Amino acid sequence: MISSFHRPTVARVNLQAIKENVASVQKHIPLGVKTYAVVKADAYGHGAVQVSKALLPQVDGYCVSNLDEALQLRQAGIDKEILILGVLLPNELELAVANAITVTIASLDWIALARLEKKECQGLKVHVKVDSGMGRIGLRSSKEVNLLIDSLKELGADVEGIFTHFATADEADDTKFNQQLQFFKKLIAGLEDKPRLVHASNSATSIWHSDTIFNAVRLGIVSYGLNPSGSDLSLPFPLQEALSLESSLVHVKMISAGDTVGYGATYTAKKSEYVGTVPIGYADGWTRNMQGFSVLVDGQFCEIIGRVSMDQLTIRLPKAYPLGTKVTLIGSNQQKNISTTDIANYRNTINYEVLCLLSDRIPRIY
């Protein structure tokens, strides 16, 4: 999907806010802890290359989801460590080694496949993934991890790190969190040759469980100024939301009582009213279920009426505004504000998803 530069819909990304958010977390965690910036999924929709370059002086490395995301950063000139958090199969090893990309290995089956395909790991840097209770990928015992580490070393790999991921670090009830933490600590204690880096702290753990940090953290959603819990838990320090989303009115008209708006004729005017059309729709990640939500025009909340279309939505206006009038979908407009979390709450989802769904069709302005 190409970026649509010839329409007024844009996402503005404040790189300085991202830098300050990361600095706030770094002040909050113990000294000497390494910081990895999580820039997977195009830095949660903010632009992986631009964010990575902005954070280059502040962080020790980056985390991405897959090899393609890692290669994008390398090709952009990012020379610090890049860790792929997902599983990379052995047939892609040569490309990872050639580009000095660190991979995650999460099972003994991976070793069996590498041997079957006669893959050597000379020059490969590895972090071992432990499943402490998330239930996705990872090993479950010290015995398995010891065997994996020995096998990787036989194949020539440098086992630099070991890590896990907490399922409930952003919840008030820390029962599951503590179970996972103790599981991971016990597993680490049973290792014959512990890797140099041990990390379990995502954004939520770094904020609310900073006393449990090992020697590295992975900062994702908090870097972009959002509360990992949505609004369930209070933040110990302020954050600046880094992305705003805006467009403009491209059509304004008056409709009469009884007129309908949008697909399915789901909205019927009860009286004469002004309606404005905004060029953003579900193809941009502004989903169909946003009917009834309000955006900002001239410092006033204006309700989305009718179904959101693929490319456009319609809003009820308090008066006739000129074409080109600014419409704020995320961010501030004359002292009033719409946050990504507000949108997530309306959709009954999480703020992460709202950002990640914003498509490439929306240009990012820095």
UniProtKB/Swiss-Prot annotation:
Binding-site positions, substrate: R136, M310
SMART domains the record matches: Ala_racemase_C (SM01005)
Statement: the UniProt record of this protein carries the keyword Thylakoid: no
Entry's EC annotation: 5.1.1.1
Pfam families: Ala_racemase_C, Ala_racemase_N
GO molecular function, one term: alanine racemase activity
Cofactor requirements of the protein: pyridoxal 5'-phosphate
Alphabetized SUPFAM superfamilies for the sequence: Alanine racemase C-terminal domain-like, PLP-binding barrel
Biological process according to GO: D-alanine biosynthetic process; peptidoglycan biosynthetic process
Keyword Isomerase: yes
GO cellular component terms, semicolon-separated: cytosol
Post-translational modification N6-(pyridoxal phosphate)lysine, affected residues: K40
Membrane-crossing residue ranges in chain numbering: none
Reaction catalysis annotation: L-alanine = D-alanine
Keyword terms of this UniProt record: Isomerase, Pyridoxal phosphate
Pathway: Amino-acid biosynthesis; D-alanine biosynthesis; D-alanine from L-alanine: step 1/1
Catalytic residues of the enzyme: K40, Y263
UniProt similarity note: Belongs to the alanine racemase family.
Function noted in UniProt: Catalyzes the interconversion of L-alanine and D-alanine. May also act on other amino acids.
Record protein name field: Alanine racemase
Source species: Streptococcus pyogenes serotype M1
Gene symbol of the encoding locus: alr
